Amino acid sequence: MSYVKIQRSIFQPIEDMIKIGLYRDEQEAISSLVHDQAKNKLEQYHKKIENMENKYHMDFSDFETKIKAASEENFEEWDDYILWESYVKAYQYWSKLI
C-alpha cells in the first residue's frame, strides 16, 4: 500500500468532519470527497459534451468522422473538435473514479 504525506493544515477539515460524525474515519471521508468531486466533474463535462452535441446535431464519434473526412479545414470546427475530444477524455477519466 502507498502512502501520501499530507500537511496537518490540509487534513484538519477532514478530522473536523469526522469529529462531528459526518464520516466514521479518514478513509471514508476522503473516499466520499473524491467520489463527490468525480460526480461533480462528470456533470460538468456531460453538460459541455451536450452543448457540443446540440451545436453540431451529432455525437462526438460522428463529428470526428465528419471533420477528418472533410476536404478543407474549417478552423472553428477543428478548434471545437479539440475541445470536444478533451471533454470526452475528461468525462471518461472521471467516470472511472465512480
Residue ranges and their predicted role:
Residues 1-66, 92, 96-98:
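Small, basic N-terminal interaction modules of short regulatory proteins
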Residues 67-71:
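Short, charged/polar, low-complexity loop and linker segments
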Residues 74-98:
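Short, compact, well-ordered microdomains
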